[in-house]
């Protein structure tokens, strides 16, 4: 979508109405595909659960820059007025890579997420809990602190650690889904005492 015409990249409310009308057939087709998938998946999940099999789903912490999420809600991300990221995700240098890993995903504007009581995130978890019995948070450590890299960097060397939402995020999660939400914390990468403390405080395996 970053290469679309401006009226499609950043449509006004009235332009959205025109787009929805002009692309009605295409939109309905995509909705049908989504409905078909969810119907088939719910049947598969029911089949597994009836046989005492639990499904573990993955929720990656970051989304792609060209995703519908960034297009629909650019305020949730650190992007410029055209939708391009100003800082991106990655990890610092380690034993496996002398220059780190430059993932390129746009980073969240956590201050804005906090103002909205993490509504987008809670909706995301709500959907994932419908699809899976247990949810694994991919790159859990990024909710404690994450590696922020200038978007014009060619490697991850110029990054820095920035605080994530930490306790506040998980307290909101508990308020939304109960004391023991079915979550697994992935612990790959640079795991510090602070990351372990956050995991243990909320009893996440």
Region annotations inferred by a language model:
Residues 1-38, 63-205:
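Alpha-amylase-like alpha-glycosidases and glucanotransferases acting on alpha-linked glucans and related
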Residues 30, 35-63:
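Conserved, well-ordered alpha-helix/loop/beta-strand core segments that scaffold catalytic motifs
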């Amino acid at each position: 979508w970053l290469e679309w015409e401006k009226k499609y990249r950043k449509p006004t409310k009235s332009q959205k109405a025109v787009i929805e009308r002009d692309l009605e057939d295409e939109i309905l087709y995509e909705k049908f595909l989504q409905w078909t998938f969810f119907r088939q998946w719910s049947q598969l999940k029911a089949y597994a659960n009836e046989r005492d099999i639990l499904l573990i789903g993955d929720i990656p912490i970051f989304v792609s820059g060209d995703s519908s999420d960034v297009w629909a809600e650019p305020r949730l991300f650190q992007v410029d007025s055209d939708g391009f990221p100003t800082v991106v995700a990655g990890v610092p240098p380690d034993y496996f890579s002398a220059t780190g890993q430059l993932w390129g995903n746009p980073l969240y504007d956590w201050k804005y997420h906090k103002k909205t009581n993490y509504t987008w995130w809670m909706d995301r978890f709500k959907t994932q809990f419908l699809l899976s019995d247990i949810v694994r948070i991919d790159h859990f450590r990024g909710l404690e602190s994450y590696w922020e890299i200038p978007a014009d960097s060619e490697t991850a060397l110029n990054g820095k650690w920035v605080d994530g939402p930490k306790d506040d995020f998980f307290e909101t999660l508990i308020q939304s889904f109960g004391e023991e939400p079915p979550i697994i914390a992935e612990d790959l990468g640079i795991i510090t005492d602070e990351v372990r403390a956050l995991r243990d405080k909320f009893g996440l395996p």
